[in-house]
């Protein structure tokens, strides 16, 4: 009852916010048009498997599983739904699903209408997706429903005395495929025992991304300091890296202003490094802000640069989307932004390239970041001084390694190898899920 009242106010809030926000307006329109789209596209004779992801990150977690099912069980069709425009707008043309739409707001009527239209044979909810009305109707209809790559913490409402009523939504799942033993322990503590610890499917996904990495001539020219010959152009993923570098390259991914204040200050003073900056927000105001902070360095923007211009530059600013996961392959050290704000972004996309990963202090809720720290492949900084000490150590170790010969293992190289080994050691979650689901 209380949940449905809250949903009603959420619905009203979205309707009002849609008048002022283009992003919310897209979501509001997409959710209202979902039933129209489903009526047009659902094949009444087909068997659908429903995947729901809140946004782009959760989609990437579920993608290895979707693609395995599509390959090994072609008798099923895939329905993919999103809650957020940041997921739907980017992946609305994804070829791995037969139908892609927004998930309607979680009212009881919407849940009944949706499930009557689609009639899924099973459903997969990725990570933090616990929509009470949809889940209760799925259970009522005896539709197998799985939570994949979910992770639980003791401070979540399900495990508090005042959250017992809402914890009932968890009992709607047929099975949980969780990331760690702590999640299993917490679920068992409230009487939920159909739980398997399989790890995080994101590890499988970043390995896939690395294998399919794009060759980026501008980044190659930037890294080498010369335009690569066409006959040498190759996938960035070859042997885990692009060809041998002449310059030390630092790659900052998904950076925010507090991150940029730290590393730009360092590289203004240490000009032996080349820097790739892929900011989280690529609006003109933010790009101009970044440019204003850089002093005494030649800067080019990716969309405006030629390989010849990139070869002569000191700083390459990425002013477009879709390249970051491949771009890490051209670096020596990675920095993942967000740690001085709401939380760090994807560290695995960098670590898979066998490179040390630096991030800010807001990382405690990110299990993969904690794993990188413990493995010796990740490094937390709390400000400029920490960053300076760490980068100088990386720079010295790289120089010593080059002068000592190939048999010497530097701090930079060993840290990168530990990061890559950490990712490789935790792959395989998709296989474990596939083995447990009855198709």
Question: How would you describe each model-predicted region?
Answer:
Residues 1-439:
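Nucleotide-activated sugar donor-binding and catalytic core shared by glycosyltransferases
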């Amino acid at each position: 009852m209380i949940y449905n009242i809250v949903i009603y106010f959420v619905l009203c809030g979205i309707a009002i916010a849609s008048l002022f926000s283009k992003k919310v307006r897209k979501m509001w329109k997409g959710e209202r048009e979902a039933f129209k789209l489903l009526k047009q596209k659902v094949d009444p004779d087909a068997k659908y498997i429903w995947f729901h992801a809140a946004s782009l990150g959760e989609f990437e977690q579920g993608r290895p599983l979707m693609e395995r099912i599509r390959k090994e069980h072609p008798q099923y069709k895939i329905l993919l739904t999103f809650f957020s425009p940041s997921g739907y707008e980017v992946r609305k043309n994804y070829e791995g699903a037969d139908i892609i739409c927004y998930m309607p707001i979680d009212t009881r009527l919407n849940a009944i209408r949706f499930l009557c239209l689609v009639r899924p044979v099973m459903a997969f909810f990725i990570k933090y997706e616990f929509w009470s009305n949809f889940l209760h109707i799925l259970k009522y209809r005896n539709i197998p429903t799985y939570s994949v790559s979910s992770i639980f913490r003791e401070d979540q409402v399900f495990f508090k005395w005042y959250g017992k009523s809402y914890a009932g939504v968890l009992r709607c799942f047929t099975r949980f495929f969780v990331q760690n033993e702590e999640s299993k322990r917490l679920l068992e503590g409230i009487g939920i025992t159909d739980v398997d610890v399989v790890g995080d499917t994101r590890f499988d996904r970043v390995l896939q991304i690395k294998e399919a990495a794009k060759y980026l001539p501008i980044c190659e020219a930037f890294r080498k300091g010369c335009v690569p010959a066409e006959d040498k152009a190759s996938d960035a993923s070859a042997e885990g890296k692009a060809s041998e570098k002449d310059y030390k390259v630092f790659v900052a991914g998904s950076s925010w202003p507090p991150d940029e204040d730290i590393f730009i200050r360092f590289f203004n003073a240490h000009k032996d490094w080349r820097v790739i900056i892929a900011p989280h927000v690529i609006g003109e105001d933010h790009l101009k802000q970044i440019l204003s902070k850089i002093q005494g360095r030649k800067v080019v923007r990716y969309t405006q640069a030629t390989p010849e211009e990139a070869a002569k530059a000191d700083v390459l600013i990425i002013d477009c989307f879709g390249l970051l996961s491949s771009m890490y392959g051209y670096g020596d050290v990675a920095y993942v932004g967000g740690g001085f704000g709401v939380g760090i972004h994807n560290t695995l996309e960098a670590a898979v390239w066998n490179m040390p990963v630096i991030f800010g202090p807001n990382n405690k809720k990110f299990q993969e970041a904690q794993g990188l720290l413990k493995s010796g492949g990740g490094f937390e900084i709390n400000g400029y001084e920490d960053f300076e000490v760490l980068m100088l150590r990386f720079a010295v170790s790289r120089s010593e390694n080059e002068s000592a010969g190939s048999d010497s293992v530097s701090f930079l190289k060993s840290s990168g190898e530990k990061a890559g080994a950490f990712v490789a050691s935790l792959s395989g979650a998709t296989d474990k899920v596939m083995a447990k689901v009855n198709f």
